[in-house]
Amino acid sequence: WKKPTVLNNVETYANVPQIIQNGGAWYAAIGTATSKGTKVFALTGAVSNIGLVEVPMGITLREIIFDIGGGIPKKRKFKAVQLGGPSGGCVPEAYLDTPVDYESIAKVGAIMGSGGMIVMNDRTCMVDMARFFMDFIQDESCGKCTPCREGTRRMLEILEKITHGHGEPGDIDLLEELSDMIKNSALCGLGQTGPNPVLSTLQYFRDEYEAHIHEKRCPAKRCAALVKFEVNAEVCTKCGICSRSCPAGAIQWQKREPAFIVKDKCVKCLSCITNCPADAIS
């Protein structure tokens, strides 16, 4: 139409009137030397206060999650935070004091992206989390370029195989090889950043992948195919919460007695594990 056109995110448009009204120097006074202004994050997941938060660039992840977000509810432990939307990376506890700016976030394997910030506690399986995001990325692939179309599909197949208890020793190397190929040859940002959830979880939580593959065990007890659904009588507090929460009536329990799971009735919904206050079910 022979008219100038501006294409940007809504967040960028929202900042423009304030910059015009108050001046560039006012805006540049907020943030860091290389990342100016504020950033809006959608804070969600295993955190007490969820919602949209606007913070100055340079604030740390710890301040956002624990000071603004109120920390992890139900006395669970912080495990990781996923930044940047589906193609972002997972950052572990060791990097909670990372400043929120473009350069620092990139150094720990994540991206600012769309401003998504998903907090995860110790009951989150990082392999299953990578599978979840890869499922989304594969579904969103337009199919134009082969690396993204076929590569993400193959990565998803491997992750599904691992979480279902059929992982093989070479799967980790293959995931890394596919990730490198997709990042370097995909045509657009989706494919180039798509492997991030897998690469970051492999970097920081490689032991979970190895437990799934070599021990056929899910440390977080979220992959039903790798859970035995057995009650540890020595750890069980005999509270009966698991029995009351079981939708299939598969858990036998009497007062002052440890619970017992009838495996023929168990539908592996994980409700007992989610609700057990003593983590007595494995």
Q: What spans do the regions from the language model cover?
A:
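Secondary-structure transition/capping motifs at alpha-helix termini
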Residues: 71-76, 140, 165-169, 275
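Short amphipathic, charge-patterned alpha-helical segments
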Residues: 58-73
